[in-house]
């Protein structure tokens, strides 16, 4: 029997009912008000699905391009895939925004379940898509997301933004770059 003050009583669909229960459980466990939990996590319609994160692997010789975040760590250019963009379009857009480069998105290196490769674990699921790209123009320009861009060899990697990409993920990108018959890896 549900308590009369539970918001579950008015849930319109099974998805809404599950979302309400989840919000109440997370509220109880975290100490956050239920409305705050809903504001953060319950704004989607239907079943919750993973967010998509794209990362561009751009090479010059035997070096890979990384961008320096405002917190001084480094990552492959990339970010959340916008709802109105394909993975390919978004990867190209993110590289332009973060590294100032015009690129072509040439092949998918890997599709990974973020939880299996990156920390910390998020409260929502994320699929990471690594895309090998080629530069066709442009140059780094000052922006609000990144401080600089630079190419690094595998043995001289700087401190990484490991919530975005790990050394193992960058090694995987190098392996794909060096292989003519790379097959997309996926979890």
Q: What are these model-derived regions, one by one?
A:
Residues 25, 40, 169-176:
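Residues that form generic nucleotide/phosphate-binding pockets
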Residues 81-105, 113-169, 185-186:
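Unchanged
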Residues 13-55:
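Acidic, metal-coordinating catalytic segment for phosphate/diphosphate chemistry
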Residues 38-76, 103, 107:
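N-terminal strand-loop-strand
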Residues 1-13:
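N-terminal secretory targeting and juxtamembrane "stalk" segments of secreted and cell-surface proteins
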Residues 173-187:
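Acidic/histidine-enriched, glycine/proline-rich intrinsically disordered or flexible terminal extensions
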């Amino acid at each position: 029997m549900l308590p009369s003050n539970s918001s579950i009583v008015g849930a319109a669909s099974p998805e809404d009912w599950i979302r309400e229960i989840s919000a109440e459980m997370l509220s109880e466990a975290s100490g956050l008000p239920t409305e705050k939990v809903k504001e953060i996590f319950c704004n989607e319609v239907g079943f919750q699905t993973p967010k998509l994160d794209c990362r561009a692997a751009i090479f010059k010789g035997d070096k890979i391009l990384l961008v320096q975040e405002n917190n001084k760590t480094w990552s492959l250019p990339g970010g959340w895939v916008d709802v109105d963009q394909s993975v390919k379009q978004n990867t190209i857009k993110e590289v332009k925004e973060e590294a100032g480069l015009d690129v072509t998105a040439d092949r998918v290196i890997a599709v990974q379940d973020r939880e299996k490769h990156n920390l910390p674990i998020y409260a929502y699921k994320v699929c990471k898509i690594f895309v090998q790209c080629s530069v066709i123009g442009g140059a780094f320009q000052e922006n609000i997301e990144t401080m600089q861009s630079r190419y690094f060899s595998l043995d001289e990697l700087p401190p990484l933004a490991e919530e975005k990409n790990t050394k193992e993920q960058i090694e995987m990108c190098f392996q794909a770059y060096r292989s003519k018959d790379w097959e997309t890896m996926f979890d």
